[in-house]
């Protein structure tokens, strides 16, 4: 079986939106594959591969950040109203790009309390916590966005 990651090259440019633990790990891994990975945070960092994005304060990345972007991973949680902050502030910009792939990092919490049973993508979501309902709503927003999205739970 061919490894899909093997088709990545230094021509690929990733934006990792929300660079906590998972986003940082993803960016580090992508860089090891020879790709460019720029990461967002809510405050300025000394890292030249980092940029500021804060949807609550409406601090939007400079247009130049998006030049040549081929892939996006969003790790940013829902806002207090349960909407996706990336789509709320950047939807039109993202739709104007020639993206090959968009990933949205969700949670297995959308499956609800399975009392230890295994779940997979064939299981129906059944959230019981408010934050899981919000995540499920964001998943739906991404799916309906028309972008080439893949949901990770």
Residue ranges and their predicted role:
Residues 1-63, 74-75:
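Hydrophobic, well-ordered beta-alpha structural blocks that scaffold small-molecule cofactor pockets
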Residues 91-130:
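Conserved Rossmann-fold NAD(P)-dependent oxidoreductase catalytic core, especially the SDR/UDP-sugar
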Residues 131-136:
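Active-site YXXXK catalytic motif of short-chain dehydrogenase/reductase
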Residues 26, 49, 82-86, 90, ...:
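Short glycine-/acidic-enriched loop or helix-start segments at secondary-structure transitions
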Residues 140-153:
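Conserved beta-loop-beta element that borders a ligand/cofactor-binding pocket
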Residues 67-104, 137-140:
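NAD(P)-cofactor binding segment of oxidoreductase domains
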Residues 47-57, 89, 116-121, 148:
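Active-site regions of enzymes building and remodeling cell-envelope glycoconjugates
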